[in-house]
Amino acid sequence: KIEYDDLWLGAAHSQMFDVKTLNINPSVAWRAHEKLSLGFGLNWQRGKMKYDRLAGVGAGGFENVKAKVDLDDDAWGWNGGLLYEPSPTMRIGLSYRSEVKYHMTGDVSLQSDGSAAGNALLAGLVGAGYQSKLKSTVSLPGTFIISVAQQLSDRWEMLGDISRTGWSSINNFDIDHSSGLRDGQRAQRIDADFRDAWRIAFGANYKYNDQWKLKYGIAYDQTPVKRSSTRMTQLPDNDRVWLSFGTQWTPNKASRLDLGLAYVFIRDARINKTITTVPHGYNGGTVSGKYEGNLWVLGAQYSQSF
């Protein structure tokens, strides 16, 4: 989720963009050989997107009307993998998580700021059919991962993985009217023009005793954004480097608690993005500048076996 001040200079690009997914992934595994295990799973996902922006820039009250988009859908995907153990101290894993295609539906509501210009424009836009049901199709990318784990001693284990995510499945994110006077017409196109992206990670586990394990890691995560002219205010992403530390507590054979902390160095992201494909003929203007920021990420996971 990303939020801006309501009246920031790029408000006709976005004021708020929020995407949430819920994934339920039942899976089965089969030990085909003493050195080879296979796994397969189905993924049911629930996706929701909320998107707010000004109607546009320029004269005529467009900066006095907000458009609020709300879309959702259910979708299915699958995942599979194998684990090969060439020796008692080495494991090699291959896995793939499929692309998931959403056919999202919802609506757009228009709101005036209460000014005379805003109220007049709102009445005109509603009368012309711009407040309506919406539909959009988007494919979330598939990911392929190769991983290796090597036991160096009774206490130390080295880890590494490389993954490729098919972000090029998202070229344009088109939102279309699906009811009323504008049925079948384009409401907005969000130009993404993503590329496939790589992630490379290395790590180590240190077994302090039978109950406690310490974890260390570093990762390089490539952005799918190609250049400043295709970087979106909805996703001002750039390349990242992760430094992480964690611990695992295993009080008994059936319980496990993992805690992790990561600091993410994000490369400064320049943007020079112009939006001209808004339906009423007024453009969204150009946003030009630079995003700066780093992240702290805290995670916790508890596992219970039965």
Where do the model's predicted regions map?
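Outer-membrane beta-barrel porins/channels
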Residues: 1-306
